[in-house]
Amino acid sequence: MTLNEIARKMCAKGKGILAADESTGTIAKRFKSINVENLEENRLNFRQSLFNASAMKDYIGGVILFDETIRQKTTLGPTIPELISNHGAVPGIKVDKGAKPFAGSSNETITEGLDGLRERLKEYYDLGARFTKWRAVYNIGDKLPSLQSIKSNAHALARYAALVQEAKMV
C-alpha cells in the first residue's frame, strides 16, 4: 500500500484509531482493578479477544500497538498484526521513548527516541506495522511554551516524520 492508501484506510468514514499501546505497567494497573494477574498470557488473551471482535471491521481503521504486542502470536495462529489486518484495520506502533525534561527548563519536555529509530522502523515494518505514533508534549502557561522548546520539538517531529516516510509508513 502507498502512504496515501494507508492514511485513507485508517481514516475511512466512520472509523477511528484504537490506542492499544499501553505499557505492561499501565495494563498491570487495569488488570489489578479487575483482579486479573498481569501475565503475558493474560495480556495476549485480552488483546486477542479485543482485536478479534466482529465490530473491528465496522469501526476501527487503525490500531496503535506496544512493542510487546506487535511481537505476539495469537493462539488462533496469526500474529497480532496479522489478526488486526484480517479484521480490516491497519496495525501501527508507538515509537517514541517518552517525554523527558527539556534541558534549561524546569517546566518543559522534549520527546526522545530518535536514536536508532531508522533500525526500529525497519523491524516494525517487517513485523507488520504500517503507521506510527509519536507524541510531543507542550506545557502551556505563563511564557510557555518557550521558543526553544517549540523549535526543538518541531525539529524532532520533522526528523521523525522523514524517517517514518522513508520506512514506507504513515
Where does each model-flagged region fall?
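Helix-rich catalytic cores of soluble enzyme domains
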Residues: D115-V170
